[in-house]
C-alpha cells in the first residue's frame, strides 16, 4: 500500500524539524532530560498529527470518492454491508469510499473508532465476487473495531522518540570523542554534527520500521480473525487466496499501508507490514 513513501517522508520531516529546533534552542546530550522531552514531543506529536489528519490525507492522496448517496446497486451494497458489519462490531458507521486503482486492495483509516474511513479500490470492487469483497470489508472494519489506528500511532510515537533520542545521544558521544582527540577541542562542528545525526536517524529509523512492521503483522492476523467472525472464515480464506493469485500491489501511501488488506511484497519479511498471504491463510485454517 502506498504507505511506505509517505511514512518515511513524514518521519524524515519530523526528524529534520526536531534537529533544527533543538539546535536553535541549544538542546544537546548534556541535558538528557531536555533531550528526552523534546524527543517525546516531536515523536508523539508527529505521530498524532498524522493520525488526526489521516482521513483527510487519505482522501487527497488516494482520490477517494466518499459514497454519500449510492449511485447504483454496487455502491448501495457496499454501504449496507459496511453498516451491518459496523453494527456487529459495535462501532459507529465508517465513511465508505472508492478510489480508482487497478490493484486489488482496500484500507481503513481515521483518528478513532467513531471517526473512520473504509475505502476499496475499483480494481478490487470489480475483480472480486461479493463474498470476497464482504470479507475484505470485514477485515477493514475489524481494524477499526480493534483500535489499530490508535495502537499503531502509539507504537510509532514510541519508536519516533527512540530514534530522535538515541541518534542525538550517539552523535553527542561521537562529538565528545572527536573533541577529546582534537587539540583545539572543537569537536564535530554544527554541520558535521547534524550530518552524523541525519545518518543515525536513517539507521535507527530502519530498526524502528522493523518494530512497527512487526506489530503491524500481528494486527493483520487479528483483523483476519475478526473478518472471519463477521463474514465467515471460508469467505476470508477465499479473499486472501484471490489476492494471492492477483498481481502484486503498488505502493500505497504510508499512512494507509498498515491497515490495508494486502501489503507489498518485500525481500525481507522483517520490513513487511503484512504477513505473507500464505501464512495468513494457514493461520485462519488452523483456527
Swiss-Prot record:
It comes from the Bacteria. One of its GO terms (cellular component) is plasma membrane. One of its GO terms (biological process) is proteolysis. Its main location: membrane. This is Protease HtpX. The chain crosses the membrane at residues 4-24, 33-53, 154-174, 195-215. GO terms for molecular function: metalloendopeptidase activity; zinc ion binding. Binds 1 zinc ion per subunit. It is found in: Cell inner membrane. Belongs to the peptidase M48B family. Its cofactor is Zn(2+). The lineage of its organism: Bacteria, Pseudomonadati, Pseudomonadota, Gammaproteobacteria, Alteromonadales.
Amino acid at each position: 500500500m502506498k504507505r511506505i513513501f509517505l511514512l518515511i517522508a513524514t518521519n524524515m520531516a519530523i526528524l529534520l524539524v526536531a534537529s533544527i529546533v533543538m539546535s536553535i534552542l541549544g538542546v544537546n546530550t548534556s541535558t538528557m532530560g531536555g533531550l528526552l522531552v523534546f524527543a517525546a514531543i516531536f515523536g508523539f506529536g508527529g505521530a498524532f498529527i498524522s493520525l488526526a489528519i489521516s482521513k483527510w490525507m487519505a482522501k487527497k492522496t488516494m482520490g477517494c470518492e466518499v459514497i454519500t448517496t449510492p449511485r447504483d446497486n454496487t455502491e448501495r451494497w457496499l454501504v449496507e454491508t459496511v453498516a451491518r458489519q459496523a453494527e456487529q462490531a459495535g462501532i459507529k458507521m465508517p465513511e465508505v469510499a472508492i478510489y480508482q486503482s487497478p490493484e486489488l486492495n482496500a484500507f481503513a483509516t481515521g483518528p478513532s473508532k467513531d471517526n473512520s474511513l473504509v475505502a476499496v479500490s475499483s480494481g478490487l470492487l470489480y475483480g472480486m465476487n461479493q463474498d470476497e469483497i464482504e470479507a475484505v470489508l470485514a477485515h477493514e472494519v475489524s481494524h477499526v473495531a480493534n483500535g489499530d489506528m490508535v495502537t499503531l500511532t502509539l507504537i510509532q510515537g514510541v519508536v519516533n522518540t527512540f530514534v530522535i533520542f538515541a541518534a542525538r545521544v550517539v552523535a553527542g558521544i561521537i562529538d565528545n570523542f572527536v573533541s577529546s582527540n582534537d587539540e583545539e577541542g572543537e569537536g564535530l562542528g554544527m554541520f558535521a554534527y547534524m550530518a552524523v545525526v541525519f545518518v543515525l536517524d536513517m539507521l535507527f529509523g530502519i530498526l524502528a520500521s522493523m518494530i512497527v512492521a512487526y506489530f503491524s503483522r500481528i494486527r493483520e492476523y487479528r483483523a483476519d480473525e475478526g473478518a472471519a467472525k463477521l463474514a465467515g472464515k471460508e469467505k476470508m480464506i477465499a479473499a486472501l487466496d484471490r489476492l494471492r493469485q492477483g498481481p502484486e500491489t503498488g505502493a500505497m501511501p504510508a499512512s494507509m499501508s498498515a491497515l490495508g488488506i494486502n501489503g507489498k511484497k518485500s525481500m525481507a519479511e522483517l520490513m513487511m507490514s503484512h504477513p505473507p498471504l500464505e501464512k495468513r491463510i494457514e493461520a485462519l485454517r488452523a483456527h
